């Protein structure tokens, strides 16, 4: 999620990899170089301020949106275990500039979800998460029954994204919201 004040979460450490301190990272970013190119990064444990750490190396796991990275001074599996659920952040002033109609996928989180019925907007839920293993899916929590549904993030189903006004309009195929 984008914090307008300072930080953008670009990854989440999910587990260890091997015995030498490498960690697996679920990418929340379209920019793979954030996990491949050595340099300074920021880690954040829940409810604590971010701390600087150096990325030594990284590689993408084949067929996944998961990366394995090596961080400076993290040299054992035990130490790597302590980083589970830490967020990897970048400063918002380091976010690449986008074209007028573009947005960062993480900006979709917490947007209201509307359908258009008989020329009337009907708010049905909100975006609570993204899944992007192979294709981008919006995880939407429906207000009427508190169920979570997965909506493919494609133009045919999500024709309108209005970041400025905090909503999207979806056009789901029949039955998709009832699954």
From Swiss-Prot:
Pfam family, one: RimM
Presence of keyword Chaperone: yes
Cellular component GO terms held in the UniProt record: cytoplasm; ribosome
Family: Belongs to the RimM family.
Listed PANTHER family: RIBOSOME MATURATION FACTOR RIMM
Quaternary structure, from the entry: Binds ribosomal protein uS19.
Name listed for the protein in its UniProt record: Ribosome maturation factor RimM
UniProt source species: Prochlorococcus marinus (strain MIT 9215)
Highest classification ranks of the organism: Bacteria, Bacillati, Cyanobacteriota, Cyanophyceae, Synechococcales
């Amino acid at each position: 999620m984008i914090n307008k004040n300072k930080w953008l979460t670009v990854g989440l450490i999910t587990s260890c990899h091997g015995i030498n301190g490498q960690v697996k990272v679920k990418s929340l970013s379209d920019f793979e170089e954030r996990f491949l190119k050595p340099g300074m990064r920021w880690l954040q444990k829940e409810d604590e301020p971010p701390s600087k750490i150096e990325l030594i190396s990284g590689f993408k796991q084949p067929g996944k949106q998961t990366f394995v990275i090596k961080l400076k001074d993290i040299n054992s599996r035990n130490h790597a275990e302590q980083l589970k659920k830490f967020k990897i952040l970048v400063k918002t002033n380091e976010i690449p500039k986008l074209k007028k109609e573009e947005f960062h996928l993480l900006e979709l989180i917490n947007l209201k979800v509307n359908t258009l019925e008989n020329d009337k907007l009907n708010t049905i839920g909100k975006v609570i998460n993204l899944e992007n293993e192979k294709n981008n899916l919006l995880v939407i929590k429906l207000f009427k029954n508190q169920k979570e549904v997965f909506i493919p993030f494609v133009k045919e189903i999500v024709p309108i994204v209005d970041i400025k006004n905090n909503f999207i309009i979806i056009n789901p195929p029949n039955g998709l919201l009832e699954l």
